[in-house]
């Protein structure tokens, strides 16, 4: 296998995509009513809810009575020192977002829809806090604009969790909901993230704390130090694969036994991805392609072993970074160590996939050796009270009492398809038990299926290579990969589906639905599609 160089380093997801919309100054304290500029054709209003969360409203002169309430995604609750890839220089902000982008907001305003959104009172995991804020914001908006007839809740990432949460807890306040690339329950998603960081620590750098951070500034320094160490590992692995794709060197920080280092380090990457449920397609690596011009045997090796390792590496980089923020934030919120893997059966998690990805894992002996090492090392043990507190920070029932659109990319490395599938499974279970319950209560109607799940599925092949045969990660992330990687057309199509549902009390269906999602691009409605379940 020839050596190669990346055109540029692996792409990391930005912390957040804040809107570049000019709005009037944001109040820092709560006020009784919004401060509106009275401009036309679009009036902008700002204010703060009783918890101090700033909000923004934008209302067109031809307001049609429907307002979209947007909930933004995860933002770290601590500043990040400069120099850390993807996140360096971030400062904590509660700037409100009334929509996913300026282009989408503009399209909605042009059609007579109003938009609004909060910056929320706290960043990090904030599901319960955000729920209270959104409830108050809806009330504030309706009092300011009494001609409002419909409220549509939507959001992405953690904001997708919040939109689904609002639909479950207070369906009387909204007419439809959109939960995009959503997070699942607080404990489940946090465990998934922490699993990834713990496995990186286990295989590649045991000095990574991965939790149990100290109090005060010392703990903050430890968490930021973990970020640096994670990206050092990622850089080392990337360099090792570039020099020797078949058998890349283990990072210098790794302390695994010398005997285990006979297994290619790339196989440990693949195992981490499989153990945590990360997709085996990433923004730039499809797990099937090879550079042109390679001998047949080398091309097959690249397809079966190297490309999957690069996909795992790109996805792990994003998952582990978020894990550091999440672990630290939840330890601050709960007052103790909440992550626990003392009862985790790691081998059971890959009972089937180890055969599917046997080449990428370097065979059965290598897989057994890697799993044996994971089983033998000391485990993370939680404070039961802290773990219970995390579980109380937000849980979905999956029961949607208003029409709800779900949409995610199946190769999202942060909140993958399994997160959306968990909502579908809960909703299906509710429908299954509700029909006999209705019959027993002499209710002749079946429970209404309010979920419309849509999927973004990547192409089978999309990895690009330079003329020299090196992977090219400078191109845009492939649709269906990366976190909340949606186009303006896709966001607009979702918004239109939500407007139809709000007006009609049910989803668009049949030919009109299929036509709309086809025109949006990379949007699939398939009743038979079932995404993999979460690993924990």
Features from the language model and the residues they span:
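C-terminal His-loop and adjacent cap/lid subdomain of alpha/beta-hydrolase
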Residues: 33-153, 161-536
């Amino acid at each position: 296998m020839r050596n190669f160089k990346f055109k540029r380093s692996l792409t990391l997801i930005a912390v957040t995509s804040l809107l570049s919309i000019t709005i009037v100054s944001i109040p820092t304290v709560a006020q009784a009513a919004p401060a509106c500029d009275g401009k036309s054709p679009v009036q902008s209003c700002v204010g703060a809810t009783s918890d101090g969360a700033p909000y923004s409203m934008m209302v067109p002169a031809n307001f049609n009575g429907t307002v979209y309430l947007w909930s933004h995604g995860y933002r770290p609750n601590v500043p990040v020192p400069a120099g850390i890839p993807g996140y360096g220089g971030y400062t904590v902000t509660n700037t409100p977002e009334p929509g996913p982008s300026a282009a989408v907001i503009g399209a909605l305003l042009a059609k007579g829809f109003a938009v609004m959104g909060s910056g929320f009172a706290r960043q990090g995991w904030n599901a319960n806090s955000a729920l209270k804020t959104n409830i108050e914001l809806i009330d504030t908006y309706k009092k300011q604009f009494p001609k409002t007839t419909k409220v549509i809740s939507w959001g992405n990432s953690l904001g997708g969790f919040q939109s689904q949460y609002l639909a479950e807890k207070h369906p009387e306040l909204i007419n439809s909901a959109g939960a995009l690339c959503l997070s699942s329950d607080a404990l489940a998603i946090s465990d998934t993230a922490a699993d990834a960081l713990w496995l990186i620590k286990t295989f590649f750098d045991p000095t990574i704390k991965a939790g149990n951070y100290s109090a005060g500034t010392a703990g903050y320094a430890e968490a930021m130090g973990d970020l640096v160490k994670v990206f050092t590992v990622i850089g080392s692995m990337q360099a090792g694969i570039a020099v020797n794709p078949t058998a890349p060197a283990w990072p210098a920080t790794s302390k695994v036994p010398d005997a285990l280092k006979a297994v290619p380090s790339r196989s440990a990457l693949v195992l981490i991805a499989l153990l945590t449920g990360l997709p085996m397609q990433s923004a730039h690596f499809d797990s099937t392609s090879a550079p042109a011009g390679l001998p047949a045997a080398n091309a097959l090796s690249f397809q079966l072993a190297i490309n999957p390792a690069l996909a795992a590496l790109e996805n792990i980089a994003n998952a582990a970074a978020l894990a550091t923020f999440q672990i630290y934030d939840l330890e601050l919120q709960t007052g103790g160590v909440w992550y626990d893997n003392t009862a985790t059966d790691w081998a059971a998690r890959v009972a089937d996939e180890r055969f599917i990805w046997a080449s990428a894992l370097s065979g059965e002996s290598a897989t057994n050796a890697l799993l044996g090492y994971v089983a033998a090392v000391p485990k993370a043990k939680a404070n039961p009270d802290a773990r219970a507190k995390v579980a109380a920070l937000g849980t979905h029932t999956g029961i949607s009492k208003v029409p709800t659109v779900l949409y995610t990319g199946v190769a999202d490395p942060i909140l993958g398809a399994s997160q959306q599938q968990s909502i579908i499974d809960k909703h299906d279970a509710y429908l299954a038990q509700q029909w006999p319950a209705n019959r027993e209560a002499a209710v002749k109607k079946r429970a209404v299926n309010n979920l419309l799940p849509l999927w973004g599925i990547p192409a089978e092949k999309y990895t690009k290579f330079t003329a020299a045969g090196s992977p090219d990660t400078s191109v845009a992330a492939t649709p269906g990969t990366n976190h909340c990687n949606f186009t303006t057309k896709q966001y607009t199509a979702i918004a239109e589906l939500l407007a139809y549902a709000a007006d009609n009390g049910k989803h668009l269906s049949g030919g009109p639905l299929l036509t709309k999602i086809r025109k949006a691009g990379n949007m699939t409605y398939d009743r038979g599609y079932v995404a993999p379940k979460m690993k924990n």
